[in-house]
């Protein structure tokens, strides 16, 4: 839970993130946070719970999209909070046989995290040809940003490349 805590307190408006990090520098023990033993620990735990609540709602919604398909695609719109990597990683651990695609629409673009237990970077590279977008990363964990008007074409090409086994 501490790992999730540290990821999540870095999310949100920058003034809230700065306040959380400043408060974190005054923490002497993780139990101050986990057991809310001090005012600083209570503040940080409350902020974490607020962010985690948003995340858990998205995670629950993403799990509703699980089908027999090899690909688990989840799309959400969130202007302030980006959970694409966190969702992709957790869903990959829960559904290791799936190709996970988490996409967040923001500013006319689809910001994506892609995960699989096998190499998908080549499929991503090929799917981006002729598309207004960019992407890359590790062999089985990639990120991409695709213009919304090209999203459907990109998605079709990426799924075809996955089937082909690139």
Label for each model-derived stretch:
Residues 70-166:
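Glycine-rich, acidic loop segments that terminate in or are immediately followed by a histidine
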Residues 1-67, 77-78:
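A structured phosphate/pyrophosphate-recognition subdomain
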């Amino acid at each position: 839970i501490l790992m999730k805590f540290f990821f999540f307190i870095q999310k949100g408006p920058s003034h809230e993130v700065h306040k959380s990090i400043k408060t974190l520098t005054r923490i002497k023990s993780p139990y101050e946070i986990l057991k809310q033993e001090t005012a600083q620990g209570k503040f940080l735990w409350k902020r974490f719970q607020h962010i985690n609540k948003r995340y858990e709602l998205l995670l629950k919604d993403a799990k509703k999209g699980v089908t027999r398909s090899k690909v688990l695609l989840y799309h959400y719109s969130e202007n302030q909070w980006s959970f694409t990597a966190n969702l992709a990683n957790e869903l990959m651990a829960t559904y290791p046989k799936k190709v996970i695609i988490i996409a967040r629409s923001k500013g006319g673009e689809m910001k994506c995290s892609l995960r699989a237990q096998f190499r998908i970077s080549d499929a991503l590279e090929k799917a981006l040809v002729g598309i207004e977008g960019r992407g890359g990363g590790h062999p089985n964990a990639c990120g991409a940003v695709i213009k919304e008007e090209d999203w459907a074409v990109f998605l079709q090409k990426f799924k075809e490349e996955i089937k082909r086994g690139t």
